Amino acid sequence: ERGHHCLILRKGNNPCCSYLAFRVYSEDDVDKAAAHFSGKGMATEWVDRPFQGRTLRVLDPHGIPLEFYFEMTRLPTMHQKYALYKGVKPLRIDHFNCFSPNVDASVAFYNDMGFRTTEYTEDAETGHLWAAWMHRKGGVHDIAFTNGTGPRLHHIAFWVPTPMNIIDLLDVMSTTGYVSNIERGPGRHGIANAFFVYILDPDGHRTEIYCSDYQTVDPDHEPIHWDLKDPQRQTLWGAPAPR
């Protein structure tokens, strides 16, 4: 990444996520986004963010706070400054995963914005979506929704080059006093085919470290269907998700 930042940490009384932000293709697209949401009768506001240009804020239909911007202070690339790589060596933020009380409605809203579904889980008895993974940048997903009480963030994810980066992280965490912060994994998801581990920071925020998914640049990509009762949809192999 060459943007000034992809994550902002602020001290507060309670752990929470204040908003999710997406960069658009041009300054004109910020105005198009404002017109798009206003045309739906949604309240919008312009907010000031450090190191960013004009930033639009809106709540999605279930109350998830979203922000859209184009301009951000750029930094020199660190891609080949290997001496600066530390820990798990994350290369970019990859996606957000949120709970939604109505996944069908969430998918329709984000589809109208230009997101496309790559994989989904459907409840065969009701015909409704249980979960969906949606993309913009050509990976498996930039945002995903799972049926549940919301708006609520399940996790953010960072992409790393190989599974060995995840193994290295686990070695470091297990020998520096953070073994109890390893929540789940390593394992491989059925959905996305990604190699993963979930970790918790001291405040309980969940982060997924993630690699080995696939590209979705084919415009004819057909969304992959998973049955809700398939136990390998969440975990192809590895420990099951905690309840």
What would you call each of these model-derived segments?
Residues E122-K137, H141-G190:
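A compositional/structural signature marking long, glycine- and acidic/polar-rich segments
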Residues L7-L9, Y82-Y85, I143-T146:
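Short beta-strand/turn micro-motifs at beta-sheet edges
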